[in-house]
């Protein structure tokens, strides 16, 4: 959904919590530069200081490494952080995502997340991805990587129109 405030982060975190509470090894990937899922799952550690050492490495650094020519890239599994909940892990977000997005706009980079999640998926029963409130590089990367998609939206005419536009964009 290309709109904030419809509950994407809350739904993502709550579905992940239910999954983990059922004994399933669960991962949340926070692709939203607002870092709401990260804050839900890591609590005070994540509030107001996304650059804290406890929040590194994060998904912003994962994408930034594709822009670097420094050699071997770290696998996505090295970006996973435990949470205070059993069976629930998170790859935290960072506001840096918004700053580097324009540098990632290329056809081969859009598939990087799908390839990385394919590798890490063997370690998890369920992976939930929280996306930003925009149809951008990160949202498209998540849609390409996902097996299923849940799109929350308000039931007004504007939101329905935005949903139809999103579905058309995904179809392309």
Label each PLM-derived region with a short phrase.
Residues 1-172:
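P-loop NTP-binding core
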């Amino acid at each position: 959904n290309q709109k904030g405030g419809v509950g994407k982060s809350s739904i993502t975190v709550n579905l992940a919590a239910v999954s983990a509470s059922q004994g399933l090894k669960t991962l949340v990937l926070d692709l939203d530069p607002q870092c709401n899922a990260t804050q839900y799952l890591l609590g005070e550690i994540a509030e107001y200081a996304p650059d804290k050492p406890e929040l590194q490495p994060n998904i912003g650094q994962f994408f930034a490494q594709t822009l670097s020519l420094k050699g071997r890239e770290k696998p996505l599994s090295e970006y996973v952080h435990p949470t205070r909940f059993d069976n629930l892990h998170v790859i935290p977000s960072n506001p840096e995502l918004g700053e580097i997005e324009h540098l990632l706009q290329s056809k081969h980079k859009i598939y990087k997340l799908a390839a990385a999640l394919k590798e890490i998926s063997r370690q998890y029963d369920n992976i939930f991805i929280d996306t930003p409130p925009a149809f951008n590089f990160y949202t498209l990367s998540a849609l390409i990587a996902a097996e299923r998609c849940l799109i929350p939206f308000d039931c007004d005419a504007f939101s329905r129109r935005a949903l139809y536009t999103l579905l058309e964009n995904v179809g392309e």
